[in-house]
Amino acid sequence: MDFESHIEKIRDKRHWWTTVDTERYSWNDIMHLVDTHPNDEYDWNRDKQRLGMNSFHRRPSAPQFAKDIFKDMEDFFVSRAPAKSHSEYEKGPPQITNIAFCGFGKYTGSYPRHKDSMDVFLVQVIGDTPIRIGYTEKRTENDEDRIMKPGDAVWIPRNTWHQLTPVASRVTFSFGFESDSDCDPSTFI
């Protein structure tokens, strides 16, 4: 993923859209990923009919595009992040985390409108999922509403309000740049 070409929006803390070649990833592929994922890295939410697979990029069965995004984010963000001594970190050293969200059925849920303390790169892999992105806690006419389709991806800067409202089975990959608040990419990229 070419994060360099979006550097101004990253510095301005604005969300931006792109596409990712998801290699026509199928439900059979995702079920193989589910079946080969370690149980201790499952995050099953029964109320939301959703399975999360933490650190899924490490699986041999993970798609190459996900492994590439993880590496590209490490190279672009983690390698450029200001260094501190280990004892100075509140959350620990900057890192890339990821989770594959698999929602099953038309009542699959997500989180209510929220903001994350990390920067998020979200990739829609299977199914269509409505998303709303805004810059205030309450919904306004300035919010952006879209339906994410397979291959759609969006950069959501930390502290940006957003909400996915799934309406059918779906797979969404989430990659996060996690760091202390004083290590916001807008300040060092």
Give residue spans per PLM region.
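Active-site region of the double-stranded beta-helix
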Residues: 5-8, 35-152, 160-189
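An N-terminal JmjN-like helical accessory module and its immediate linker preceding a catalytic domain
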Residues: 1-38
